[in-house]
């Protein structure tokens, strides 16, 4: 079962699997809420155009195609989490939540219940079974510019055992060439960049439309606790933000922390964004069956952030402490931190808090 978004990547994944001899079924997930019109754009993974494109590709490949309704689950597991995170002063990653709960959670469970051996997606990452370790491993895709392993750190061993990632050994250029060779109409289709369920305006407008009564103004404080002004509500701010603060201090200032207990936005100088230590919750580990006492890793604190050398320490309750060799700028609670050793994904978690040392 191939999760088809109507884009070139998942379409090419379906084509490659059929060519390899698999019996392929294409599915598109209906995710947009009933009270929200489907995204109108050309590239959104949930848009009506996406469904049309996926169906056309399935017809060309001569594979069965279905649209599956995951609206209610998506609203509970992704949209509600997205809104709640911003209200709590965190910056969420809805794509990771969707991968964890929807694609490789509910969709995989449905496929297995139907007797289907694997689900497949168009992610740029590699997975294989390592006999020496007795584990399935996950690694970056060959195309460093398109690598999506960061968004896949939540894989369990059971999920990896029943997942195929056909594009891991290809570059984006090669994928488009393969799609063109198959005569797929999406071979030159632009990529989707937006949050799929935010159909109008930006994410702030979306949160306001769905949780206006929960957004409360509060104080803007400096790092010493002095009141500098008023903010419009925590969801309107994120770590590292400089514009839109409404302050005239005669010097640049940045959001350095969000304090939900005091409903406060904390601002400071650029140097105040630098931190060497983070704490992460809800960690998942792919490379390790048993956790070491500590380990050297490289870590990525945002999807497109460069990796940085660090020492990882396990903590109780699925938490971890990560100490970077050099200070990192704008480490943001709510975002994922993903640990690597070479090309291999060690695992990752959700950034909970930061510290200086």
Curated annotation (Swiss-Prot):
Its EC number is 2.8.1.13. This is tRNA-specific 2-thiouridylase MnmA. The keyword DNA-binding does not apply. GO terms for biological process: tRNA wobble position uridine thiolation. One of its GO terms (molecular function) is tRNA-uridine 2-sulfurtransferase activity. ATP binds at residues 3-10, 29, 122. The active site is at residues 98, 196. Keywords: ATP-binding, Cytoplasm, Disulfide bond, Nucleotide-binding, RNA-binding, Transferase, tRNA processing, tRNA-binding. It is found in: Cytoplasm. The gene is mnmA. Gene3D superfamilies: Adenine nucleotide alpha hydrolases-like domains, HUPs, Translation factors. NCBIfam families: PRK00143.1 (NF001138), trmU (TIGR00420).
